Amino acid sequence: RNYADPNKLICVMKNPAHQLAAKIQYESGLRIAGATSIRPEQLRGITSDKFTGKAVAHLNYIGKGGKAGIAQMSPDTYGQLVEHIARHGSFAVSQDGYRGALKQAAKLTGQQYNGSHGLRWNFARERFYELQAAHVSYETALGAVSNELGHNRIQITYHYLGLD
């Protein structure tokens, strides 16, 4: 359900806004609605990841069921987002157009199309292993990924990680 090479997928996308939405989704685990519609007041700046200590950028969002959350992404992607918002007033991408671009990119790179949700799967797995590599306990890493995905039940995160 995840992409074999999400970076390659993102690189072949022709529209820079679609590329940016894909980077945001891949790096933050946001659902498509959160990654394709961002207003300036959601931007929270750059800080340190509380688990790894690396520099990350934060973004407030309202997720599924009206649940508030904080997404994080690389400072580079955040910088691109800030630039886009400075030029256009907000970041707004057609979800259908974005899905079509992902489908085309999957075809061009020989990967199975897994929708935009496939990038959430990539995020979940890579984030979990990043936390484990930083010596975060299994339970804490699982809880962190679950929270970052906006899930209320850890059982759903087991599914994303292929642990069920």
What are the residue ranges of the model-derived segments?
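Basic, Lys/Arg- and aromatic-enriched nucleic-acid-binding interface segment
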Residues: 3-32, 139
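Short, leucine-enriched amphipathic alpha-helices that occur as contiguous helical runs
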Residues: 6, 17-19, 99, 120-121, ...
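Catalytic phosphate/metal-binding cores of nucleic-acid and nucleotide-processing enzymes, i.e., regions
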Residues: 15, 40, 47-49, 59, ...
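DNA major-groove recognition helix of helix-turn-helix
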Residues: 34, 39, 160-161
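Active-site-proximal segment of tyrosine recombinases
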Residues: 35, 114, 124, 132-150
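Conserved tyrosine-mediated DNA breakage-rejoining catalytic core shared by Y-recombinases
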Residues: 37-80
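Catalytic-site neighborhood detector that most strongly recognizes the C-terminal catalytic loop/helix
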Residues: 65, 148-164
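Active-site/catalytic core of tyrosine-dependent DNA strand-transfer enzymes
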Residues: 72-130
